[in-house]
Design a protein with these regions (language model features):
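Gram-negative outer-membrane assembly/targeting C-terminal domains
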Residues: 1, 104-120
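C-terminal solvent-exposed extensions
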Residues: 1-6, 94-95
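Second-shell loop/turn segments in exported
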Residues: 12-23, 56-64
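Flexible, polar/acidic helix-loop-strand segments at domain edges
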Residues: 6-9, 105
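BRCT (BRCA1 C-terminal) domain core and associated BRCT-interaction motifs
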Residues: 27-28, 32, 36-109
């Protein structure tokens, strides 16, 4: 008997930067993401940190890969508009990060994550 194993369509190694101004939000979001099951996406949070240089009003995703399909799919699953995804290469990317989620002040207020059980 041959068994087939379905691999996820998207694999995202995620860095989270908290630019919302609320200390610890990056840790809460990391825990939330790790408890989620995104059907066709393997999501690994590689790093999470507080962004100390400046605050961001709006959340966005930086695709670290030229093909931004996985980052756009992640945006949809997080309740963000895929147009918020920009591309910027990450130099010296030893962690093989494929996307960076920058949490802005809007993320805190909006309840961005779709409800559990909602199609993701």
């Amino acid at each position: 008997m041959t068994r087939s194993v379905e691999l996820p369509q998207y694999s995202v190694r995620l860095e989270i930067e908290n630019a919302s101004g609320q200390a610890g939000l990056e840790k809460q979001i990391t825990q939330e993401l790790q408890s989620r099951n995104f059907n066709d996406m393997q999501l690994t949070v590689v790093e999470a940190s507080q962004f100390k240089i400046r605050k961001a009003a709006k959340s966005f995703i930086i695709s670290r890969e030229e093909n931004g399909d996985a980052a756009e799919q992640l945006a949809l699953r997080l309740g963000l508009d895929p147009s918020c995804v920009i591309y910027r290469e990450l130099e010296q990317n030893s962690e093989h990060i494929s996307a960076t989620l920058v949490l802005g002040k809007d993320f805190l207020m909006s309840g961005r994550f779709p409800a559990r059980g909602a199609k993701s």
